[in-house]
Amino acid sequence: GEIDMAINIAPGDMSLFSNKDKYNISAIASLRDVLARMNVKEGKPMYDKRVREALLSSLDRETYCKVLLKDTFTSGGPLMPPSVDYGFDQLKDPNTYNVERAKKLLEEAGWKDTNGDGYVDKEGKNLEMDFIFYSGRAELPLFAEATQSDAKKVGIKVNLKNVDYNVLDGIGVRGEYDLLISNILT
């Protein structure tokens, strides 16, 4: 068949259209933002700022964007994408990828692997969190799986929970998550 226009092409499918003799590609930066939220309420693993910073420092977000998401995403902080000129390029991430920093922060927060299972623990309990996502957008499971893998390298156990999109907002509003990822169009 013929294609006059296609939108929302998944990062993994872009290579299908790489033949410049067959396809004329015009692409712009999306106004879609992926939001990974942390539940910072007392009693939750992310209540301690050092744990939050450790998790963020354990994640190689630049590689996620370049490799997993085929350079179709930009790692960043604000809800405004780089295509909206509000100084995005001047922001500095204080929690860039740094496994040693992540391990040090966890140790400062009292988390150590005392039983040799590969996960840090405190008072006999592993540092464990559930990451809620939905699979309706191709990038969300990829990001969740990469987070699980990178977090394990510093001793944080991340359990992946794929939920129906229709219940995602309710889970977020009720605070029934440790980590939750979704996206919005800005």
Describe the function of each predicted region.
Residues 1-42, 54, 62, 66-67, ...:
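Extracellular/periplasmic solute-recognition and catalytic clefts
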Residues 3, 22-23, 73, 111, ...:
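Short aromatic/hydrophobic-glycine micro-motifs
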Residues 9-12, 112-185:
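Ligand/substrate-recognition segments at binding pockets and active sites
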Residues 10-13, 47, 51, 60-64, ...:
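Stable alpha-helical elements in mature extracytoplasmic
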Residues 29, 34, 56-90, 139-148, ...:
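Detector for C-terminal structural segments
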Residues 42, 46, 75-114, 135-142:
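Structural transition elements
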